[in-house]
């Protein structure tokens, strides 16, 4: 969450071989979830002719991917982390804008959420029998010329992924991903958002950074391949 996942989804979903670009909020606990994924996609979009992939992103611990169950043998798994300070700031900023009082508008609660997510992802990687690929999420914005060719190779895409992407029917809509104006640009925006109004307690940030470094290293160590800062 808040790790350029909407940007990643749009870049991937703009390729002729890939369908999907938004978060579908599905638990993949058995192969029947793949039918649900296709049904959710068809609510707003149509499959591209001669395409190979159907994309989804799992951003929260509420949604699981049970790869030990039959039916998931042919999926491709990409995993990414974003460093804690900007991620936590982005979470707080997002929830502070909501009209109702939100738990994650608190830097302390957002930090707790972030740490719990990292720990679940690291555990997932330690126990995963299938191949997966890791990248530092910041590379989508800071060095797409390095990251996108690697992603194209992992997914066996020809032509390779482009820095330009399509604006789709669900782009910017609530519960579909990033709802800011940035996602409507159609290309990678390298503007760094100012979060100077948010204060994360130093002890909390220090703890998040320690967990991030540990979990990130574990995810890199177990990956089939990785691209890092």
Where in this protein do the model-derived segments appear?
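PAPS-dependent sulfotransferase catalytic core
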Residues: 1-52, 164-222
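Short catalytic/ligand-binding loop motif for oxyanion handling, primarily in non-cytosolic enzymes
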Residues: 3-9, 28-30, 63-65, 86-90, ...
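Short beta-strand segments
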Residues: 22, 54-57, 134-136
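Soluble or luminal CAZymes and related metallo-dependent hydrolases
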Residues: 36-37, 59-60, 109-117, 200, ...
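Glycine-rich phosphate-binding loop used to anchor ATP phosphates in small-molecule kinases
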Residues: 47-67
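C-terminal non-catalytic accessory extensions
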Residues: 225-229
């Amino acid at each position: 969450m808040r790790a350029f996942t909407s940007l990643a989804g749009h870049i991937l979903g703009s390729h002729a071989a890939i369908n999907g670009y938004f978060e579908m909020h599905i638990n993949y606990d058995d192969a029947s979830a793949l039918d649900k994924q296709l049904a959710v996609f068809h609510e707003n979009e149509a499959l591209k002719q001669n395409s190979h992939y159907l994309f989804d992103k799992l951003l929260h611990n509420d949604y699981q991917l049970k790869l030990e169950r039959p039916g998931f043998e042919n999926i491709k798994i990409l995993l990414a982390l974003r460093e804690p300070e900007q991620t936590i700031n982005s979470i707080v900023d997002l929830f502070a804008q909501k009209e109702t009082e939100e738990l994650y508008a608190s830097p302390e609660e957002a930090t707790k959420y972030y740490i719990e997510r990292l720990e679940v992802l690291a555990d997932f990687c330690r126990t995963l029998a299938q191949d997966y690929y890791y990248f530092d999420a910041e590379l989508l914005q800071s060095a797409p010329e390095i990251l996108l060719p690697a992603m194209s190779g992992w997914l066996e895409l020809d032509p390779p992924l482009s820095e330009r992407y399509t604006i789709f029917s669900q782009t910017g809509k609530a519960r579909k991903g990033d709802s800011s104006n940035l996602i409507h640009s159609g290309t990678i925006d390298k503007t760094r958002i100012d979060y100077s109004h948010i204060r994360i307690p130093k002890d909390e940030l220090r703890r998040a950074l320690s967990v991030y470094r540990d979990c990130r290293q574990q995810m890199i160590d177990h990956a089939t391949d990785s691209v890092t800062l």
